[in-house]
Amino acid sequence: MKIIGISDSHGSHWDIKVPDGDILVHAGDFSSQGRLPDTLDFLRWFNTHPHKHKIFIAGNHDWLMEQDPNFWRIIKMEFPNLTYLQDEACEVEGLKFYGSPQSPRFFNWAFNRDRGADIKRYWDKIPTDTDVLI
């Protein structure tokens, strides 16, 4: 099985030459400012790839995903071939993936948490049997 990992495309995803593989993973920062048009453009692009499975998380630039915590429902309805993980797991062909957008505070970006107990409560949820952590 071949897993292709990309991240930090910041709205320039159309310029990326994505290699063939079985699973395509985008590890966040697919937009620069997390606006709805940018997010939808990324989702359309991500959905065009032939990889059997496509998994992604938000990054600290992907504000929409934090500001509208129910936006994932739209993703699931409009893009059923995409898997969005926000502090949750999925299993793909026997591999256990866990995705979390939470990151240590850096200025005032999306999904920033204070170091220590605040961020630890998210990271403590990561299952010990996770094969791929995003």
Language-model-derived ranges and their functions:
Residues 1-3:
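Extreme N-terminal starter segment of soluble prokaryotic enzymes
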Residues 6-92:
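Core catalytic region of metal-dependent phosphoesterases/phosphodiesterases
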Residues 21-23, 56, 68, 80, ...:
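Active-site-proximal loop/helix segment associated with metal-binding centers of metalloenzymes
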